[in-house]
């Protein structure tokens, strides 16, 4: 399923809307405190939700999910498009602190279930609402 055609302009638009709608309620509870600490990255904990939402919007034929464990042994998620372009909406949690995301260890993955899937749906509804008003 594709909600919107996949092209550079739509990718930029949707990426901005996704990032603008990332809020603490979309982070697993275990990560919320880490984000609230002074100097913490506001992107930490959002990588699965943001990446999965992007895939839901543009479809699995256009966007694939990838993940790898980082230097803290925590999973990091990002997307790769049909042309092999890496799309990481939450990369600032690494680059903003002088670290590199674990792309070199990336493996294809699927959307997580349970609470993760619910958070993706909440974000997707927010993004759809913005897109409907454009």
Spans of model-derived segments:
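A structural boundary/capping signal
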Residues: 1-134
């Amino acid at each position: 399923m594709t909600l919107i055609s996949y092209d550079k302009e739509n990718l930029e638009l949707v990426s901005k809307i996704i990032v603008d709608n990332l809020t603490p309620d979309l982070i697993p509870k275990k990560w919320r405190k880490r984000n609230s600490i002074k100097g913490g990255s506001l992107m930490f904990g959002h990588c699965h939700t943001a990446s999965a939402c992007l895939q839901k919007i543009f479809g699995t034929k256009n966007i694939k999910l990838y993940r790898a464990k980082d230097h803290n042994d925590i999973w990091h998620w990002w997307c790769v498009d049909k042309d092999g372009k890496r799309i990481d909406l939450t990369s600032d949690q690494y680059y903003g602190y002088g670290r590199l995301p674990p792309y070199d260890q990336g493996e294809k993955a699927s959307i997580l279930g349970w609470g993760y899937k619910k958070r993706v749906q909440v974000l997707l509804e927010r993004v759809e609402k913005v897109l409907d008003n454009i």
